[in-house]
Amino acid sequence: MTKLSVNINKIAVIRNSRGGNLPDVVKAALAIEGFGADGITVHPRPDARHIRYDDVRNLKRVIATELNIEGNPIDSFVDLVCEVCPAQVTLVPDAPDAITSNAGWDTVAHREFLTSMCELFHRYGIRVSIFVDPKPEMVRGAKECGADRVELYTEAYAAGYAADREAAIAPYVEAAEAARECGLGLNGGHDLSLENLAYFCERIPWCDEVSIGHALISDALYYGLENTVQMYQREIRKAK
């Protein structure tokens, strides 16, 4: 069954808006684990506007589920990942000033660089996922780079879901089938929500993991954190 990794960046945004350590992102991550999440995702950026590098170090010491670190593999990020040795690193080609991730890798054009990154992280025993648009050629390119998984950038699916969910999911099914055919694990993330999650998992039941942050933390303001984590897990289970 698809696993739920909760991105806690938005919790760090609230903390950083006031200074101090409230809310405590480590305490929140432990609570989210206790409420039933299968993993914790963080996306530290160079400007430290939400998750900071020290947060990542502190999280690795205490969480019991999988830690997934997302980010653009600049030198400082690579050094952090090799130091912390999470279960998974997800390589994302976002610019330093990007508000959020907005495109996947061109795994053909950047094959040499991505191959070197996969080789490096594998030496530390870290599973490597590459963030890609839902295009079979990008999925196959990730395989050629030596990745273990791809994460499909699901923003277009989420944006098109209300108007025509079948049309919205179609390119993702095609890309997911390409991943399965070439032996890649499969993740999904970006703008997945209570509205569109169940159908995504229903149509792509072999998806290994979804990473959800903004929508889940927003829903937690209305429903409470414990209830919200369990609501998302129920949406995933609908696809069984």
Regions found by a protein language model. Name each.
Residues 1-70, 74-76, 80-86, 167:
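Conserved N-terminal beta1-alpha1 strand-loop-helix module at the mouth
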Residues 2-8, 40-42, 67-69, 89-91, ...:
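Hydrophobic faces of well-ordered beta-strands that scaffold small-molecule active sites
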Residues 36-38, 62-64, 83-89, 123, ...:
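Glycine-enriched alpha-helix->loop->beta-strand junction motifs that scaffold or abut catalytic
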Residues 49-75, 107-129, 165-188, 194, ...:
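Alpha-helix-loop-beta-strand connector modules within alpha/beta enzyme cores
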Residues 60, 103, 164-165, 219-240:
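C-terminal helical cap(s) of enzyme catalytic domains, especially alpha/beta-barrels
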Residues 75-85, 135-145, 188, 192-207:
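Catalytic cores of alpha/beta
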Residues 91-98, 149-161, 206-225:
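Glycine-rich phosphate-binding active-site loops on the catalytic face of alpha/beta enzymes
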Residues 127-179:
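Histidine/lysine/aspartate-rich catalytic loop segments that bind and position anionic ligands
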